[in-house]
């Protein structure tokens, strides 16, 4: 990789201006090399309070702006992203370590999200009116107010965008805190919003660590939209347990199962399993963590080919040639945590099929791992956010479903099977928000809702259903002229 110049932060984005930060130093690194990429500052308490103030000040005007005008700004944002497509894709790869092909796909998702969000808003929150004998029954929707969007590092542009765009379309103003791992990507996204001509104060960006996030959540806000770990989502939920008026949309990952049935095309099963478990270095919330495999010749052959495919998988920096399938996990610190988690599973009785190991010192580059947990005692129901698959063997299909449901989470689940009846049985009994058949567990569409049950979420699915948590319904009975009804209720006398 060629030597990179360190990106100096533009500062915090408040009231339509970049303001040089005064807080503690914040840095992001390229996880494939460990080199410093971006340098800036954490937002101070004063900067956070000021951002909240200007967001409230901008709210009335923005909420009263017509939907068509708000949509025009989002389309202007798309035009800016298009202009910066190559730069944004490269920056995503530099800051997350993703292969360039995957970052380019993410940029396309950012662009496509706007029209889908406009369509979803018009379908799910469009005003309706019904005439009755006595009055007009009207349904309209209002924005919540000032909402906080907490970004995730694995899709630093797309996932945040999936909250921001619907929130703005609905008339909310936004306080955006990106992941501390991906501040450079956030700055470019915000610059695109700035160049779209969006009015000052409608979106504000505050860079910082978890402490900044906590300060932000203590402000006068009306909603929090979060994508991340269960532990962080639970803390947010607990922080607002005495404030039921705050709407929370929490997407918190999962310990997702993928069941392999008796299939004819083993190579196809391996391919879809690779996309389920290893894509994005296992750092998608929908990645399959538990692979449930028949204890049969089919299962043995599948595991043999799956392990071989993992060994042959290309891993490296985004600009390596030939192109890698995956890059690093987000940091060296996280890589070490994942290796420690693997060690703990071995101590519980897990049998290593393919060891996950650190490939380059002081980076996030780790090789994929596979461990057989069939005979392990009390394996933890935890999400290991890495290219790491836990294998469980089963003897009959009912047992496979039982194993799949042995989790407190419920985000995604998948079945690879030639048997439609088995899929119908699987679909009926599996508890998850995304259930796929002969597709990777990571396969999702922005034209559908995205969210889970159990510890994976709080019944506020995003994607196409994000419009639902960005506005609240208002029911009105209306008539333009005040009149006394021809038939009055008994016992009521007017003089």
UniProtKB/Swiss-Prot annotation:
Q: If you read the UniProt record, what top EC class would you report for this enzyme, in one word?
A: oxidoreductase
Give me any GO biological process, just one: arginine catabolic process to glutamate
Glycosyltransferase is among the record's keywords: no
Q: Which CDD domains match?
A: ALDH_SGSD_AstD
What residues sit in the active site? 251, 285
Binding-site list for NAD(+) = 228-233
Quote the protein name from its UniProt record. N-succinylglutamate 5-semialdehyde dehydrogenase
Organism in which the protein naturally occurs: Legionella pneumophila (strain Lens)
> Which gene is annotated as encoding this protein in its UniProt record?
astD
């Amino acid at each position: 990789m060629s030597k990179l110049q360190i990106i100096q932060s533009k500062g915090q984005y408040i009231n339509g201006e970049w303001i040089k930060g005064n807080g503690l130093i914040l840095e992001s690194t390229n996880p494939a090399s460990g080199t410093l990429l971006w340098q800036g500052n954490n937002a101070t308490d004063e900067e956070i309070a000021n951002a909240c103030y200007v967001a409230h000040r901008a709210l009335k005007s923005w909420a009263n702006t017509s939907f068509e005008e708000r949509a025009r700004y989002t389309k202007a944002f798309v035009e800016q992203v298009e202009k910066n497509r190559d730069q944004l894709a490269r920056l995503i790869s530099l800051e997350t370590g993703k292969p360039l092909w995957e970052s380019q796909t993410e940029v396309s998702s950012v662009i496509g999200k706007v029209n889908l969000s406009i369509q979803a808003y018009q379908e799910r929150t469009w005003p309706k009116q019904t005439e009755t004998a006595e009055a007009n029954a009207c349904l309209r929707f209002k924005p919540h107010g000032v909402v906080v969007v907490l970004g995730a590092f694995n899709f630093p542009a797309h996932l945040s965008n999936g909250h921001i765009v619907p929130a703005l379309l609905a008339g909310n103003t936004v306080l955006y805190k990106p992941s501390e791992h991906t501040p450079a990507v956030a700055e470019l996204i915000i610059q695109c919003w700035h160049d779209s001509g969006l009015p000052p104060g409608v979106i504000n960006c505050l860079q910082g660590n978890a402490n900044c996030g906590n300060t932000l959540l203590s402000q006068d806000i009306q909603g929090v939209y979060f994508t991340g770990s269960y532990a962080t989502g639970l803390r947010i939920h607990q922080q607002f347990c005495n404030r039921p008026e705050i709407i929370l949309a929490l997407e918190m990952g999962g310990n997702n199962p993928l069941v392999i049935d008796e299939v004819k095309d083993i190579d196809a099963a391996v391919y879809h399993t690779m996309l389920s478990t290893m894509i994005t270095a296992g750092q998608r919330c929908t990645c399959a963590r538990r692979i449930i495999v028949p204890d049969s010749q089919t299962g043995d052959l599948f595991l043999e080919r799956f392990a071989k495919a993992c060994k042959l998988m290309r891993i490296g920096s985004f600009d390596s040639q030939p192109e890698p399938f995956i890059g690093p996990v987000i940091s060296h610190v996280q890589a070490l945590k994942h290796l420690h988690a693997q060690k703990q599973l071995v101590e519980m009785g897990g049998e290593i099929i393919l060891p996950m190991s650190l490939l380059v010192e002081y980076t996030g580059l780790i090789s994929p791992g596979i461990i057989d947990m069939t005979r392990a005692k009390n394996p933890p129901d935890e999400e290991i956010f890495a290219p790491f698959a836990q294998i469980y063997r089963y003897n009959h299909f009912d047992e496979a479903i039982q194993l799949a449901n042995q989790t407190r989470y419920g985000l995604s689940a998948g079945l690879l099977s030639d048997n439609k009846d088995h899929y119908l049985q699987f679909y009926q009994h599996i508890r998850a928000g995304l259930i796929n058949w002969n597709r990777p567990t990571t396969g999702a569409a922005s034209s559908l809702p995205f969210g889970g049950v159990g510890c994976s979420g709080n019944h506020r699915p995003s994607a196409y259903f994000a419009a639902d948590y960005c506005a609240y319904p208002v029911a009105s009975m209306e008539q333009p002229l005040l009149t006394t009804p021809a038939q009055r209720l008994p016992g009521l006398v007017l003089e």
